Amino acid sequence: LEQHKATIKPTNLWSIPLMGAAGAVSAYCSWQLDHASSQMLLTWLLPFLWLMCTSRSQAVAVAASYYFVAWFDMSIAAHRITGWPQTLGFSVLTLYVCMVALIWAVAWTGPLVPRCIRFIVLLAVTNMPPLAAFSAPSQLLSAGWLFPNLGLYGLIFCIVSWPCIALIFLTNNKKIKTASIVVAVLLVATSITANVAWEHGQNAGNLVVKNLDTQLPRYPTSKS
């Protein structure tokens, strides 16, 4: 036990509330900002923060704070709409947050490459029923901002972007880092091209807003 205590540095302990605060801020902004595209983009931060975590404690802090803040308004709305006791809404909220945070915590692992692989499975689990039925803004909606109207390809590009950028920052393997940089550059170029095409289509009056599940448009409504 004494040996374990000696390995814990104050900076590591401070990083836990800091990562939790980062998760809470990203959740708050993703709900409170008026512009839909800003909300979609900010939901991109949760998986990135999780991939950047260096311990399971940080992973718990990020996930728990994000989902608690993002889901807080829903518990209040449920109280106002149904008339149920507010304590019931908070109890359900706490149970849901603990369940989802536990999933994100269990999925976290020290080795970076397995962490990136687990992340894709984790993303699928937390964005499908039953969890998705009560979920905060889906992280996959950020695909609509980064790669508008690219459909399934945009969704795949968005999922790839998270581990790709994390590998750039965290890996010491030169080959993996180089490959990640190349992929990141291609993704950025694709994102810019898709957004330019989207803006051109909007200005020309040819923008057709599709269902988010099929085309993932940049905005849920177009200008009339």
Write out the residue ranges for each language-model feature.
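A short aromatic-anchored loop/beta-hairpin motif
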Residues: 223-224
